Amino acid sequence: KDALNREGVERVINRLKEMDFDYIVCDSPAGIETGALMALYFADEAIVTTNPEVSSVRDSDRILGILASKSRRAELGLEPIKEHLLLTRYAPGRVDRGEMLSVGDVQEILAIPLLGVIPESPSVLKASNAGEPVILDHESDAGQAYDDAVARLLGEKRDFRFLQEEKKGFLSRLFGG
C-alpha cells in the first residue's frame, strides 16, 4: 500500500484514458488509507459503499468529506465529484428489529443519491469463494440488486427491490419452506 504515490496513479489512469475505455473503475479498500485516498483523489464519480451499521456509515461520511475537500476536482475548483450511495448487506428483518440502520436513516445521514441496496445474502459469500461476481447469479437477490444498481448508474430507471422482509406464506410457514 505504501508503493502508491499520486504521480504513479495519475500515470496509470492517463494511460487507461488513452485506451478509450468507456469507464475506468478504481476500487479502493475500506477505510481511509493510501489506496483509498489515491482512488478518491482522481475520481470523477464515486460509488460510496457502506453497510447499514453506524461505524460503516461514519466512515462513509468521512469519505464524502474527503471527496468534497481533498480530491483533484476540489483542489482545482472543478465541478464536484458525482456521488452515489450503494448500501450493502441490507437485512430488512434486522432493520425492523432495530438491529441495523434503515435505508432512510443512511440516506438522511449521508445525503447523497441512492444507487442501490444489496440485500444480505449467502450467495455473495458463495460467489466470492468461487471467484465469480455475484452479479452473474441471476437467481440471487444480491445478483439482481447489483444488476439494478449498474443499470441505474448507466441512466436506466429501475425500482428499488429487496427493501422489505419477504413474508412467508401459510404453507411455507407450516412446512418450514
Language model: regions and residue ranges:
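Conserved catalytic-core segment of NTP-binding enzymes
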Residues: G8-R11, L16-Y23, S28-P113
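Glycine-rich oxoanion-binding loops at beta->alpha junctions
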Residues: A3-E7
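Conserved short-loop catalytic and cofactor-binding motifs
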Residues: K1, V48-N51, V134-D137
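C-terminal lobe/tail of nucleotide-utilizing enzymes
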Residues: A74-G177
